[in-house]
Amino acid sequence: MSNKAEKYSQLRTMIPEMRRVKHIYFVGIGGAGMGGIAEVLVNEGYQLSGSDIAENTVTDRLSQLGAVIHIGHNADNVKDVDVVVVSTAISADNPELMAAKELRIPVVQRAEMLAELMRYRHGVAVAGTHGKTTTTSLIASVYGQADRDPTFVIGGLLNSAGTNARLGHSRYLIAEADESDASFLHLQPMVSVVTNIEADHMDTYGGDIEKLKNTFVDFIHNLPFYGVAVVCIDDPIVRELLPRFSRKVVTYGFGDDADVQAVGFTQTGYSSQFTVRRSGVADLNLSVNLPGEHNVLNALAAIAVASEDDIEDEAIIKALAEFQGIGRRFQQVGDFETAKGEVKLVDDYGHHPSEVAATIKAARQGWPERRLVMIYQPHRYSRTRDLYEDFVEVLSQVDCLLLLDVYAAGEAAIPGADSRALCRSIRVRGQLEPVFVASTEQLQTVLPEILQNGDLLLTQGAGNIGVLSRNLAQSNLGFNVKEAEEKNG
């Protein structure tokens, strides 16, 4: 056991029924969601091991904390463990999963393990199609500033903490709630946040938007009768569902009927300024180091949660003003001097049309004088197919577009739902001439020809484009193609 794990081992009493469990194994431990839960457990004192197909920053960190990491999946890895944790991304024929079932070792979903961590804590669960990671990070930052010392599990790197998960000493657990596979229904928090609801991951819901809506209603009703739902009333589906919520509801948004309302929004570069109005208390004049109206909504959610928990306004103001951002969420990579002049590079994870539209809007508001050049990598053929016309519409809004091939995420190709098809459809609209980039070698040739002095270059998507962005930065917007491909692997 590591010294750090030893330090926190007394907190295992927060899950008393798990005392029989000593060794926990994670299949696919390098994922952000899996790795975050694993980090909390290893710091609680559990013997922890796991496997993934390659090393990454998550596995490196867990190894430093005392976890045993296996590269590659092998049935022998699970023979001496007490429980195996998997995500829905793990296939049924995974050798470790098959061995665990043969040995009658309990196999639990990632969300079930998160639910156990939350069972004996005051849980704050953040759900929604967009904004979960940023909202969860903001809530965790406010609670940290207020000396509430929360445990948190976030789907992205919280820059101020240098990690996406942390074990706190208090009763609070702040975590993302994943609706992509409906696994958030395992959670039973004290506070549930819903940022918005849109059609995404529709294979989980049989392509039925009503089933998706009903699942969010069930999520709200997992709250105890004394729990609180904090929801964005600006979202049309959330507004539609409000009459069905039979729990206390606090709404937030820009609209006049919001319980927690933002007015007077302005943006200067990466910073947003606004005033918050709440019933019966003084207005708050705030600044948050995040661009765009969508991030003001995320901040409002954090303010609403904190206000319900009687956190002082001073802590809210300071936490938002000093917020250092999250990895790959409109992340300022740097300003670079190229042969053509100065170029600003920003990297963003958004991969749904609404997310891409919000990112473009924030870029236009913060840097209206700059030409917007986007390198976009579509994520999943099924999403590209299901939201094809929306993607064509939103991607046509940039000044210059380079399209990488679809990041399949394990899916088989779907005819007519690829980047070449998107290029053709965007070109037909006549607003811009998109460029399909078939390889990183081609990008190395094309990009210098396209960039101009003063451009804002935005790398956008949820696949391996973040690695590409880092390689661009490391070599002043030129990169080692072989190294990039090896890292992207």
From Swiss-Prot:
Tell me which domain of life the UniProt entry assigns to the organism this sequence originates from.
Bacteria
Pathway in which the depicted protein is active: Cell wall biogenesis; peptidoglycan biosynthesis
List residues binding ATP: G128, T129, H130, G131, K132, T133, T134
The reaction(s) annotated as catalysed by this protein in its Swiss-Prot or TrEMBL entry are: UDP-N-acetyl-alpha-D-muramate + L-alanine + ATP = UDP-N-acetyl-alpha-D-muramoyl-L-alanine + ADP + phosphate + H(+)
Its subcellular locations are: Cytoplasm
Q: Does the keyword Amino-acid biosynthesis apply?
A: no
Matching InterPro entries, A to Z? Mur-like_cat_sf (IPR036565), Mur_ligase_C (IPR004101), Mur_ligase_C_dom_sf (IPR036615), Mur_ligase_cen (IPR013221), Mur_ligase_N (IPR000713), MurCDEF_pg_biosynth (IPR050061), UDP-N-AcMur_Ala_ligase_MurC (IPR005758)
Q: What is its EC number?
A: 6.3.2.8
Q: Which family does it belong to?
A: Belongs to the MurCDEF family.
HAMAP family linked? MurC
What is this protein for, i.e. what is its function?
Cell wall formation.
- This chain belongs to the protein called UDP-N-acetylmuramate--L-alanine ligase
Gene, per the UniProt record: murC
